[in-house]
Regions:
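Conserved pre-motif I regulatory segment
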Residues: 1-13
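Short basic/glycine-enriched coil/helix segment immediately N-terminal to the Walker B
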Residues: 6-8, 83-84, 96-104, 127
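Conserved Walker A/P-loop ATP-binding site and its immediately adjacent core
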Residues: 21-28, 40-71, 140-145
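Conserved P-loop NTPase motor "coupling/switch" region that bridges the ATPase
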Residues: 49-50, 105, 122-203
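Walker B catalytic acidic pair
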Residues: 109-111
């Protein structure tokens, strides 16, 4: 199970509808805070970690995550939860508001943390002082895309160290262009350490139906000749 393989700093990878959200909450509830729903209900430790979910503005506004919280008796309204702790759901546009949070648990949802902009800077600051996992359908297209997550996991101190160890730039272009990566065996090993794939079986079957209709045979014949 993906839940058994998750750890702090993991990337939970799966398509839409694969169950990433509920798996992430199950990890927070059980492995991070000692709760259980298996044989009998065991509540989380008292007090549990505050929970912050950074997601898309659409998911925040449609309360999609609120529905995922309910089975775990969690809510953004402390009065509706027996734990009375802080649960925050907000968008990536507001991630900078939470850089001073400490000793909480963060779920980063629906966004590849790539590049070197404000979101990545806030992400790296948050991960220094909190526990976290990241949910993504497409975690990275190139090794450069993994730099922020590798730094957050402590594999490299900064981008400069990563580039020095692994990146060869093309010398004949006016702008930085990666020519090749070196020591890819180490990169593959590091990615394997943090990437957890969801197993998702689509229970759909092909259904063919033949519909007999009238048509203009002459017109059809002329059309197919052109």
């Amino acid at each position: 199970m993906a839940l058994d393989r998750l750890n702090n700093g993991s990337i939970l990878c799966g398509d839409t509808g694969s169950g990433k959200s509920i798996t992430a909450l199950a990890y927070y509830f059980s492995k991070e805070n000692g709760g259980s729903f298996e044989d009998e209900y065991i509540p989380m430790k008292d007090p549990p970690q505050d929970l912050y979910i950074i997601t898309t503005a659409r998911k925040r506004d449609t309360l999609e995550w609120e529905g995922e919280l309910a089975p775990f008796l969690l809510s953004t309204n402390p009065k509706l939860s027996p734990y009375h702790h802080k649960v925050v759901i907000d968008s990536w546009n507001n991630i900078g508001k939470y850089t001073e949070v400490k000793d909480a648990f963060f779920i980063f949802d629906e966004q590849r943390v790539v590049g070197y902009g404000a979101w990545v800077k806030a992400f790296l600051k948050i991960t220094k002082s909190n526990r976290w996992i990241l949910l993504s359908a497409t975690p990275g297209d190139t090794w450069m895309d993994y730099i922020p997550v590798f730094i957050a996991n402590g594999f490299y101190k900064n981008k400069t160290e990563f580039v020095r160890r692994h990146v060869v730039f093309n010398r004949f272009t006016r702008y930085p262009k990666v020519d090749k990566y070196v020591d890819c065996g180490r990169l593959i090993k590091l990615r394997k350490m943090i990437l957890v794939n969801m197993r998702f079986m689509k229970n759909t079957k092909r259904n063919d139906e033949t519909v007999i209709v009238d048509y203009d045979k002459k017109l059809y014949s002329e059309t197919t000749k052109t």
